[in-house]
Structures are given as structure tokens and as C-alpha cells.
Amino acid sequence: MSDDTKKQDTAADAEVEKEMEGVPEHLRDDRGSEEDASDDLSAALESLKSDLEAAKQETLYAKAETQNVRRRMEKDIQDARTYAATGFARDILSIADNLARAIDAIPQELREDEKFKGLVAGIEATQRELDKVFAQHGVSRIAAMGLPLDPNQHQAMMEVPTDEVEPGTIVQEMQAGYMIRDRLLRPSMVGVAKKPD
């Protein structure tokens, strides 16, 4: 190495030292060794790798949550379509009840009277049409008579003392119950057998 080069290096070192005056020791980069720099780079690389892994996990969780939300939304939409007529069907049940009562109230002699045969046939046809429309929309009548009481479908209104059937068996139906597909629309109001006193 020439003297000029040594002088330049010494001058550069002196200039650097002069600039570093007043800088606290903990802020000075005195490492100087490649091993320390390599360790710092390795630590930084490991930190970045762990951050990347955490970001990947968060992305997977976000994708899974998005998929779950989409599935729930699709199910809600399907349920809304399937059970859209629930309110209307519940309201129309009282009309069906009144129509059934009207048919039951027609005495046999009026059914046979030529003047009323058309009226009776019309009321019965209306009842059949209503039942058909109910079936098209998934509304079905709940079976009750002679079956054991099912609190999910029947509402016990009274107990009837009798020895003819097992206690807990439905012996009287005061109001028909209905389901809309697999959901209860209205429970059957029933009388249930009990052992006589």
C-alpha cells in the first residue's frame, strides 16, 4: 500500500471519527464484523418468516370465515324461500277451520235436498282446493286422534277421564294443528286421556 493511500484512509477515518463525535455509544454502529451483520440478518429473516406465517394463518382464517358467512347466507335465503308463506298460511288457517266447521254443521237432510246439493258440493270443493293449495306449499295437518301426546306438536287443553285408552293418548281434537314442511305452524289443541278417579 502506498503512503498516499494510507494517508487517505487515515484522513477518512479521522473524518468519520469527527462526524461521530457527539453520537451516543448505543447508536454507533461499531459492529464491524460480518458475523454480527449475518446474525442480525438471520434474526430479521426469521422475524419476517414468522410474520409471513402469521399473515398466511390470518388469511386462511379470513377465507374460512368468508366461506362460513356465505353458507349461512345461502341457508338463510333458502329458508326464506321455503318458509316465506308461513305468516300467510298461519292467517289462513282460521279460514280453513271455519270452512271445516261449516261443512260439519250441514245436516244430512240438507245434503240430500236438491236445492242445497250444489251449495254443499261447492263448499266441499272449496275445502278440497284449500287442502290442495296447502299441500303445494308444504302445509300439512298434524295427526292427533288416538296418538300419544307429543308436546312438540300437540297442546293439551284438558284431560278426559277414561279407561278405554292408555293415559296420555289423545281422545279429542278441538282444533287441528298444522306443520309447514318440518316446522310447526300451529299445534293441535287436544284432550288427553287420564285414568278415572
UniProtKB/Swiss-Prot annotation:
One example of a Gene Ontology biological process annotation: protein folding
Any single GO CC term annotated in Swiss-Prot or TrEMBL for this entry: cytoplasm
GO MF terms, alphabetically ordered: adenyl-nucleotide exchange factor activity; protein homodimerization activity; protein-folding chaperone binding; unfolded protein binding
UniProtKB keywords: Chaperone, Cytoplasm, Stress response
SUPFAM superfamilies found in the cross-reference section: Coiled-coil domain of nucleotide exchange factor GrpE, Head domain of nucleotide exchange factor GrpE
Matches recorded under CDD domains: GrpE
Biased composition (Basic and acidic residues): 1-31
Region: Disordered, residue numbers: 1-48
Pfam families tied to this protein: GrpE (PF01025)
Main localization category: cytoplasm
Transmembrane domains' residue ranges: none
Domain of life: Bacteria
Location(s) in or outside the cell: Cytoplasm
Complexes and interactors: Homodimer.
Cited function: Participates actively in the response to hyperosmotic and heat shock by preventing the aggregation of stress-denatured proteins, in association with DnaK and GrpE. It is the nucleotide exchange factor for DnaK and may function as a thermosensor. Unfolded proteins bind initially to DnaJ; upon interaction with the DnaJ-bound protein, DnaK hydrolyzes its bound ATP, resulting in the formation of a stable complex. GrpE releases ADP from DnaK; ATP binding to DnaK triggers the release of the substrate protein, thus completing the reaction cycle.
Family: Belongs to the GrpE family.
Protein name, UniProt field: Protein GrpE
Native organism: Erythrobacter litoralis (strain HTCC2594)
Gene label: grpE
